[in-house]
Amino acid sequence: SGFVDRVDGWEHDGRLYLRVVDYKTGRKTFDLTDIWNGMGLQMLLYLFTLEREGEALYNREIIPAGVLYLPARDAVVAGSRTMSEAERRRKVDAELRRRGIVLDEPEVLAAMEEPGEAGIRFLPVKVNKAGAITGEALVSAERLGKLARHTGRILEEIGRELAAGNIAADPFWRGPDHNACQWCEYAAACHFEEGRGGDRRRFLPAVRSEE
């Protein structure tokens, strides 16, 4: 169970562009490798559900415009007495920068945040010297569609595994600080141990944004 923290909309040419926003007190990142392997899907499920069901609610064609994790914490930065105001502002902005993906359409990005003298402050993108917006967070409508279809396949697979009663310990592993066992609530009952009784970690292949 769960609920959306915030949904932002922008209406343009009869279409409603929606982005899902989640407030985070920690340093949550949008990790495509985790997403592609079936973890951290919540924000995308919200977005694609809105795309599928939203037209009946809003009487508009719904276009998914992205998902963003928004820091919900005070920006505390290290500095010195000689630090300039501009440098201090850059450090603060970096702490408050959103994480996620956004639709790679100039009009949509401008509706989210107009570039100022310092460029784009809060979206997870950059403005290069030529004035073009760049960054791995930019995704085309085609790639969002691919991600939606893949998410649907993952849900179907999860449903089949649940129906089959598959409860085998099969923890993913990307390192000592990024693995399924790190915060697992069932560790006391599971007793998973690499190499014992057939216990094996599941190493995840890295997924690049351009894929």
Residue ranges of model-derived segments:
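Structural signature of nuclease core domains in nucleic-acid processing machines
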Residues: 1-211
